[in-house]
Structures are given as C-alpha cells and as structure tokens.
Amino acid sequence: MSIFDKLKSTAGQAVNAAAQSLGSKRERFTFAALPESLAEMQALPEASLDTPFKTAALTVLALCAYAADKSIGTEMLNWLRGPRPLNGQEISFLNDRFRDGKTYLPFTYVAGSTPDNNYTPTQPYTITVESNHVSGEEQGYMKLFIPCGGADDPRPIKMRQRGSDGKWFLWEQYLLTGVRTPKAADPWA
C-alpha cells in the first residue's frame, strides 16, 4: 500500500468513525418565518450547509415553499441539491404528491402539526432532525430521520457530502409519502 493509499484509507476511516459516532443525535431548528424566496433561505444561518442536519431542515422549508409556489420551491430544492438539479421525473413526482390539495404534506414535519389541527404548525416553526446507528454507514452520505405529525415513525432523508468543500447536499428524500388524513378532509372525523 502506497503512502497516498494509507492517507486516503485513514481519512476515510476518520469520516466513517465521525459519522458513526453521531449515533442517536437530535437537532432542533427554529425559524421565525418560512422563507419565501431562495435569497431568504440563503440568508438563514443553516444555509452554510456545513452539517447534514441543517440541509435536512432546509429541505423541509423548501418543500413547504414548493407547496405554495412550485417555481420558488424548485429554486430552493435545486440549490439544496448542489450540482444535481431536479430532473423532469423528479418534478413530476413532486407535482403528483401535492395533487388533490395535499399541500399540507411538508408541514407535517413542523412541530405542532397534527391531523386534528389540519397540520397547522405552531410558531415559531420548529423542525427536528435525528440520526441513529445506521445514519453514517455509507461513506460520504448521511441518512437522517425527521419526525412526522401524521405518521408513527420518522421519515428518512439522505444527504451527500461534497468532498471539495465539505458541504452537505440533498441526495434523496422520502418525506412526501402518505400521512393520516387531516380532520377537515376526513369524512369520518
């Protein structure tokens, strides 16, 4: 093994050890208001994208923006995805998830949102992001979980770290899956 290979191996082991040492970690992010433009999002302290937790929290905000304005939400999501913007299939998927008035979906990840209050979050807006023992299993990626007011288990979201600057970007999100029907839309409520 060459010196370079040893250095590379040591660096990789350090990243894996750091990721796995996260274990069960929980971070809460509080926002006075939801950003209404990419510039407003980029002005937030979390926009440094220096931890996967920050990027995950901003992803929820971007999805909330998408529910209100697809163009602004797309801008935000593309920025959070770094060098890998949304493709046509991914945009079609997003549009499908918000169909039939399901614009409440991303708000289920904001504290205070429940089916009984039609997923109306409390203010200030708080988003919790969690890691567990499997979060850092894949080098350069971090699988995190966001508790959902409309489901029993937190939903996964995956980030990827860019090697050149250490920033974390959105890789995959599984946040727009089915949740309990909001009370106003439930004929049996």
PLM regions: where:
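Glycine- and small hydrophobic-rich membrane-insertion segments that are intrinsically disordered
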Residues: S2-R28
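Large, modular interaction/toxin scaffolds in secreted and membrane-associated proteins
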Residues: F4-A11, A68, Q123-P124, S135
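Context-gated lysine
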Residues: K6-K8, K25, K54, K70, ...
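Surface-exposed, polar/charged interaction patches used for macromolecular assembly or partner binding
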Residues: L7, G112, N117-T122, T181-K183, ...
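Core segments of small alpha/beta cavity-forming domains
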Residues: Q20-A111
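Generic hydrophobic secondary-structure signal
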Residues: L63, L80, Q123-T128, L144-I146, ...
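Surface-exposed, charged secondary-structure patches
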Residues: S92-G150
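Short beta-strand edge/turn micro-motifs at domain boundaries
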Residues: P147-W188
